[in-house]
Amino acid sequence: MPKTIMLLGSGELGKEFVIAVKRLGQRVVAVDSYDDAPAQQVADRREVIDMLDGRALDAIVAKHRPDIIVPEIEAIRTERFYDYEKQGIQVVPSARAANFTMNRKAIRDLAARDLGLRTANYRYASSLEELRSAVGEVGLPCVVKPLMSSSGKGQSTVRSEAEIEAAWSYSQSGKRGDIAEVIVEAFVPFHTEITLLTVTQKNGPTLFCPPIGHRQERGDYQESWQPCRISPEQLEEAQNIAGKVTEALTGAGIWGVEFFLADDGVYFSELSPRPHDTGMVTLAGTQNLSEFELHARAVLGLPVPDITLLRAGASAVILADRVGNNPSFDGLDAALAEPGSDIRIFGKPVMRPYRRMGVALMSGEKGSDVDELKRQAIANAEKVMIKCDETV
């Protein structure tokens, strides 16, 4: 019998996940705060609610009686997940994991205090005055992030005391949900940022994908590439950390575990209990199973015998540059002209500056120069021109 999966949050990552589980014969109810979100376009049914409204969430769970609930975003009343688990509904990866990882405070304290992992020095602040004090304690430069946000929203780097007030205002405008508190992190002098996609299984060992390198701008990923070449010692340390934190959080699924690589070691940064935006590079066929196919198998309790690197690849985001509706895309012929190139348009009905509307992918042989693949992906992303009905 097919299972009914309720997807909470229906963006581009959710869309690829829905496609993966549909290929395995499952039914999906896609939920978001607006209609015609990307994942809703490929799901069996859809619901439009405020997912921070616990009563609205309870109502659609009672209506559809899902076997599995898969959260894709942070702005959800996640404490309701414990009740759903008691009702016999599988929450992915688990209610505990969803509650911890939707809030940067919970996951950072688990990593640094409970598990003793190496992280950046950090403090919390719930007001502008507390932020001034926290910055004084961790030092400059530092990074200010809302406890709940996504795609870099509300995140900024503070390099002088004069920037503190603007950082607070920006954090409040970019937060998800109703939590005003921020985390203030000392800047780590890293040379590389990586995502280690980690797969925990119901009936199998924890597996790791080849590391993915990425570059951030405005707190959001711009390009990613796989494999990211790091030392065997750093890879082993990252895998050990990822294994510890996912074991502590419990559950089955894919996790995007982010690290800073610095001269003095590996620093745990963040963790997402779901497919990761930097992992869209796996859509270029870099692995035998994409991150979305891995998540689908793990969620459904299906075996993942191994994860094999098949080729090198890179991704580059296609961003909107203005506000508008009903976007259309020109330049696809030029962007797809080179061998190994691919484009994914997400299907978002509304655009705004810096909103991610698609991704350009490039792949090559295993030994290919990933820097060159990255340059090609960026060039192809720039060839895609977005038109829209502009709003005033």
From Swiss-Prot:
N(1)-(5-phospho-beta-D-ribosyl)glycinamide binds at residues 12-13, 72, 277, 348, 355-356. One of its GO terms (cellular component) is cytosol. ATP binds at residues 104, 145, 150-155, 185-188, 193. Keywords: ATP-binding, Ligase, Magnesium, Metal-binding, Nucleotide-binding, Purine biosynthesis. It catalyses: N(1)-(5-phospho-beta-D-ribosyl)glycinamide + formate + ATP = N(2)-formyl-N(1)-(5-phospho-beta-D-ribosyl)glycinamide + ADP + phosphate + H(+). GO terms for biological process: 'de novo' IMP biosynthetic process. Its EC number is 6.3.1.21. Pathway: Purine metabolism; IMP biosynthesis via de novo pathway; N(2)-formyl-N(1)-(5-phospho-D-ribosyl)glycinamide from N(1)-(5-phospho-D-ribosyl)glycinamide (formate route): step 1/1. It holds the Pfam family PurT_C. Mg(2+) binds at residues 258, 270. GO terms for molecular function: ATP binding; magnesium ion binding; phosphoribosylglycinamide formyltransferase 2 activity; phosphoribosylglycinamide formyltransferase activity. Residues 109-300 form the ATP-grasp domain. It is an enzyme of class 6 (ligase). PROSITE patterns: ATP_GRASP. The keyword Nucleus does not apply. InterPro entries: ATP-grasp, ATP-grasp_carboxylate-amine, ATP_grasp_subdomain_1, PreATP-grasp_dom_sf, PurT, PurT/PurK_preATP-grasp, PurT_C, Rudment_hybrid_motif. Signal peptide: none annotated. Belongs to the PurK/PurT family. Homodimer. Involved in the de novo purine biosynthesis. Catalyzes the transfer of formate to 5-phospho-ribosyl-glycinamide (GAR), producing 5-phospho-ribosyl-N-formylglycinamide (FGAR). Formate is provided by PurU via hydrolysis of 10-formyl-tetrahydrofolate. HAMAP family: PurT. This is Formate-dependent phosphoribosylglycinamide formyltransferase. It comes from Chlorobaculum tepidum (strain ATCC 49652 / DSM 12025 / NBRC 103806 / TLS).
